[in-house]
C-alpha cells in the first residue's frame, strides 16, 4: 500500500477527530478480542460498556454513532450478543424509535408557534431565577403528560433558533445563505464576551429543562416509557400510578424546583448566567420584526400549529395510539394545512432525530450484550436476597447506578420482571410488591440524571445540534447535573426507604 493512500485512510478514519481519539478507538477494537480470549465474555462485556460510555463522553470530538457503531459491530462478531438479541431489543423499544422518527419531526413543524411562545416568555420575564424556575416547572408539567423526548425536542428547537438569531447578527451575516452558526470566526471581539455569556445562559436553561423532564416524567403512567411497563406489570391505571408514586415523586419535585432556585441564586455548577442586554435587544428586535412581517397566511399557519398542538396533547393524554404515530398525525395535519408539500422541505424536519435514532440502535446493541451476558443478574439476586425492609432502598440505589450506565427502560424491565416472578411464586405480599414497584420506577427515573446516557432525553440533548453551539459537553452535563443528582437521588432514596 502506498504511503499517500495509507495517509488518506488514516485521515478518512473518523474524519476530523483528534489523532489520539482515533488511536484510542483502534486500541479498543484491537484489544477486545484479546480480552475476550484471556478474561472471558463477562469481563469483555463490562469493558465494552465502558468503551461505549467513553464514546458518549467524547461526543463533541466525534459523533458517537461511528465509534460506538464499530464497537457494537465487533461485539456482535465476537458473539457477545447475537443479531437476534439486538432485533428483539429493537422490537421491544420500537415505540421509542417511532417517537424519534416522527414526533421530533412533528415538533419541527410547530417551531414557529413554539418560538413565538418561548420568545415572549424569555423576553417578558426579566428575572433569570424566575425564568429558570418556569422552564424547569413547564418541562416537568409537560413531561408528566407528554414524553420527555418530545419536551426536550421543543426546548432544543427554541434554543437553536434563539442562538442562530443572535449569532447571525453578531457575526454580521444577516442575509448570508451559507451562514454557519457553529463557527465564531466571523464574530468580532466586541461581541464575543456577550456570545459566551449567552451560551452559558442557554446551557443553564437547557439543563434546568432537561432535569424538569425527569422530575415530571417520574410522576405519571405516560411520563416515561418504563412507567408504562411498570404500571402494566403492577396493574395500575393512570390515577392509581400517580397515587402510588406520589409519596416519593411529589417531595422530590418540590426539592428539585428549590434546587433550581438555589443554583441560580448561588451561581454554582455553571448556573446563574444572565441574558446580556445587547443580546436581549437583538432578540427583541427580531421578535418585533417577525411580528410586523406576520401576514394573514402566517397567522393562519400559527393557528393550524396551535390546533395541531391541541390534537397532540389530547391524543397523548388519552393514549389513542403510540406516541410516534401521533407525531406522524401532527406532521400530516400541519404540512397539509400550511402548504408544505416540497419533499426537500419536509426532509429537513427529520435531520435532527434520525442520527440519534441510529445511535439509539447502537445503544440497544450494548443493552443486548448486557442482557445476553447477564451482567446485572448478580446485582439483582443480591438485592432480592436482602431482608424485606431493606429491599426498597437497595433496589432504588441499584436501579439508579445501573440506569446511569445503561438504558433505564432495560433496567426497569429486568427488575420488574424478577420482582413480578417473586410475587407470582408467593415469595412476597402484594403490598411489598407495590412498594418495590415504586422503588424500581423512581430508581430508574431520578438518580439516572447523573449521566447523559442515563436518560434518553439527556442523551438526545448531548447529541443534538444545540450541544456544540453552546459548548455543552458530556463532562459539563455531568457537572451541571451533579447537584440535582444528589438532591433527587438522596431524597428519593430516603422517601423510598421511610415514607412508603
From Swiss-Prot:
InterPro entries: Na+/H+_antiporter_NhaB (IPR004671). It is found in: Cell inner membrane. It catalyses: 2 Na(+)(in) + 3 H(+)(out) = 2 Na(+)(out) + 3 H(+)(in). Keywords: Antiport, Cell inner membrane, Cell membrane, Ion transport, Membrane, Sodium, Sodium transport, Transmembrane, Transmembrane helix, Transport. This is Na(+)/H(+) antiporter NhaB. It is a multi-pass membrane protein. Na(+)/H(+) antiporter that extrudes sodium in exchange for external protons. GO terms for molecular function: sodium:proton antiporter activity. Belongs to the NhaB Na(+)/H(+) (TC 2.A.34) antiporter family. One of its GO terms (cellular component) is plasma membrane. The chain crosses the membrane at residues 28-50, 68-88, 98-118, 121-141, 145-165, 205-225, 244-264, 301-318, 350-370, 394-414, 449-469, 477-497.
Amino acid at each position: 500500500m502506498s504511503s499517500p493512500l495509507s495517509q488518506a485512510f488514516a485521515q478518512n478514519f473518523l474524519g476530523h477527530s483528534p489523532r489520539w481519539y482515533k488511536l484510542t478507538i483502534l486500541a479498543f477494537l484491537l484489544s477486545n478480542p484479546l480480552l475476550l480470549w484471556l478474561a472471558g465474555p463477562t469481563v469483555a462485556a463490562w469493558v465494552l460498556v465502558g468503551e461505549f460510555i467513553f464514546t458518549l463522553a467524547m461526543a463533541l470530538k466525534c459523533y458517537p454513532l461511528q465509534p460506538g457503531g464499530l464497537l457494537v459491530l465487533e461485539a456482535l462478531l465476537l458473539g457477545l450478543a447475537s443479531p437476534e438479541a439486538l432485533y428483539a431489543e429493537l422490537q421491544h423499544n420500537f415505540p421509542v424509535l417511532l417517537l424519534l422518527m416522527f414526533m421530533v419531526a412533528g415538533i419541527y413543524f410547530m417551531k414557529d408557534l413554539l418560538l413565538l411562545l418561548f420568545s415572549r416568555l424569555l423576553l417578558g420575564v426579566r428575572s433569570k431565577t424566575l425564568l429558570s424556575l418556569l422552564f424547569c416547572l413547564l418541562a416537568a408539567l409537560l413531561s408528566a403528560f407528554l414524553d420527555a423526548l418530545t419536551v426536550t425536542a421543543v426546548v432544543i428547537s427554541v434554543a437553536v433558533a434563539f442562538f442562530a438569531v443572535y449569532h447571525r447578527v453578531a457575526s454580521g451575516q444577516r442575509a448570508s445563505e451559507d451562514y454557519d452558526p457553529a463557527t465564531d470566526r466571523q464574530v468580532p471581539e466586541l461581541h464575543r464576551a456577550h456570545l459566551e455569556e449567552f451560551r452559558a445562559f442557554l446551557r443553564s436553561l437547557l439543563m434546568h429543562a432537561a432535569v424538569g423532564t425527569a422530575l415530571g416524567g417520574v410522576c405519571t403512567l405516560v411520563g416515561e416509557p418504563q412507567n408504562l411497563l411498570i404500571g402494566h406489570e403492577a396493574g395500575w391505571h393512570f390515577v392509581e400510578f400517580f397515587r402510588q408514586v406520589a409519596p416519593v415523586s411529589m417531595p422530590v419535585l418540590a426539592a428539585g424546583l428549590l434546587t433550581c432556585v438555589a443554583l441560580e441564586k448561588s451561581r454554582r455548577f455553571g448556573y446563574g448566567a444572565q441574558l446580556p442586554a445587547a443580546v436581549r435587544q437583538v432578540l427583541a428586535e427580531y421578535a418585533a420584526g417577525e411580528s410586523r412581517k406576520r401576514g394573514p397566511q402566517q397567522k393562519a399557519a400559527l393557528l393550524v400549529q396551535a390546533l395541531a398542538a391541541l390534537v397532540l396533547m389530547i391524543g397523548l393524554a388519552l393514549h389513542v395510539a403510540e406516541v410516534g404515530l401521533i407525531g406522524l398525525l401532527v406532521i400530516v395535519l400541519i404540512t397539509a394545512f400550511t402548504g408544505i408539500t416540497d419533499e426537500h422541505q419536509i426532509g429537513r424536519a427529520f435531520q435532527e432525530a434520525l442520527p440519534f435514532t441510529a445511535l439509539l440502535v447502537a445503544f440497544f446493541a450494548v443493552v443486548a450484550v448486557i442482557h445476553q451476558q447477564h451482567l446485572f443478574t448478580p446485582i439483582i439476586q443480591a438485592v432480592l436476597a436482602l431482608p424485606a425492609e431493606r429491599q426498597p432502598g437497595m433496589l432504588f440505589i441499584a436501579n439508579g447506578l445501573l440506569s446511569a450506565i445503561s438504558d433505564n427502560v432495560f433496567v426497569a424491565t429486568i427488575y420488574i420482571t424478577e420482582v413480578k416472578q417473586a410475587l407470582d411464586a408467593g415469595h412476597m405480599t402484594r403490598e411489598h410488591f407495590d412498594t418495590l414497584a415504586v422503588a424500581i420506577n423512581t430508581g430508574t427515573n431520578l438518580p439516572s440524571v447523573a449521566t447523559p446516557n442515563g436518560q434518553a432525553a439527556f442523551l438526545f440533548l448531548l447529541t443534538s445540534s444545540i450541544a456544540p453551539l453552546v459548548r455543552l459537553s458530556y463532562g459539563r452535563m455531568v457537572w451541571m447535573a451533579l447537584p440535582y443528582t444528589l438532591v433527587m437521588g438522596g431524597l428519593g432514596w430516603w422517601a423510598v426507604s421511610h415514607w412508603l
